């Protein structure tokens, strides 16, 4: 732990680590934004809907310093990836796209870190393409069965056109900030600059983003993730914040993972909410280090 702490203290900031941004076409009109740093062993990070690569800025530098090549992949409709109006935004379709992007990047047997809804994609990827995944760390993200959450469905109850009239950049930032605060333990990290960073991909294409969100609200999965979790054989670690928050991983989801996965552990992070990589980044880096050892 002392060596890890020293590494973190001496790690370059995210902005100081040279980034390679590559937009990868995975299908006609479907482009995924990838951001890579470092040259070591591959570590793939999948964000939630908001945040993009920016949401991992506090851990990518330290992880590169520890010898990893970090690769943030933003799923379709997330962050700066494209927001096609008629695409399939189911988690299953997103999983296929992520695997396509990784194939084009030449990545195999990577560690994965996924936050929030990104974890639902990562779970499926580890089942669909075990050759790509050697270990998975979920940051407060459970085995969600659908991208069409009750909140999404409610937001688009009256259709996307009305939403476009009601939501501008300022309104989006306000709503995202409110949700981040509700789902955080220590909220001091939630500044105006951070909220702008978390929403930059969406505000760059407001109309397209709203179209994508509406499609997510109507997405359907072809089969159940719960019925296939037993096929996931790599080590899986779940980090959860101890501060109660609306988007937390439910007790039923935790029990399901514990029952179905052969190598599963949960770590509770005191004082944190959903955004552990923001509130306690050193805990996430330490968890990645332990996962790296367990997956060899």
Regions found by a protein language model. Give the residues of each.
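Flexible "cap/lid" loop of the alpha/beta hydrolase fold
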Residues: 127, 136-167
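Short glycine-enriched nucleophile-adjacent loop
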Residues: 119-130, 136
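Active-site loop/oxyanion-hole signature of alpha/beta-hydrolase fold enzymes
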Residues: 17, 27-30, 35, 75-117, ...
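Catalytic active-site module of serine/aspartate enzymes centered on a nucleophile-bearing elbow/loop
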Residues: 261-296
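Conserved HGGG/HGGXW glycine-rich cap/lid loop of the alpha/beta-hydrolase fold
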Residues: 30, 35-80
């Amino acid at each position: 732990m002392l060596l890890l702490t020293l590494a973190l203290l001496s790690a370059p900031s995210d902005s100081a680590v040279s980034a390679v941004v590559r937009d990868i076409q995975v299908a006609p009109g479907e482009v995924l934004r990838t951001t890579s740093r470092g040259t070591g062993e591959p570590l793939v990070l999948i964000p939630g809907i908001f945040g993009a690569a920016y949401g991992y800025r506090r851990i990518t530098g330290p992880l590169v310093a520890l010898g990893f090549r970090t690769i943030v992949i933003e799923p379709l409709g997330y962050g700066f990836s494209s927001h096609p109006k008629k695409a399939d935004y189911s988690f299953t379709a997103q999983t296929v796209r992520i695997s396509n992007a990784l194939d084009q990047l030449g990545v195999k047997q990577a560690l994965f870190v996924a936050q929030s809804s990104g974890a639902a994609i990562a779970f499926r990827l580890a089942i669909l393409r075990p050759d790509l995944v050697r270990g998975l760390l979920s940051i407060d993200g459970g085995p969600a069965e659908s991208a069409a959450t009750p909140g999404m469905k409610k937001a688009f109850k009256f259709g996307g056109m009305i939403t476009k009239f009601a939501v501008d950049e300022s309104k989006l930032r306000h709503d995202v900030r409110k949700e981040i605060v509700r789902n955080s333990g220590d909220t001091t990290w939630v500044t105006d600059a951070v909220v702008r960073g978390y929403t930059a991909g969406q505000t760059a294409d407001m109309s397209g983003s709203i179209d994508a969100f509406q499609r997510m609200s109507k997405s359907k999965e072809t089969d159940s993730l719960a019925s296939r979790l037993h096929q996931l054989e790599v080590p899986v670690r779940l980090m959860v914040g101890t501060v109660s928050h609306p988007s937390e991983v439910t007790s039923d989801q935790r029990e399901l993972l514990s029952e179905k996965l052969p190598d599963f552990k949960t770590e509770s992070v005191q004082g944190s909410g959903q955004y552990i990589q923001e509130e306690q980044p050193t805990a996430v880096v330490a968890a990645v280090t332990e996962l790296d050892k367990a997956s060899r």
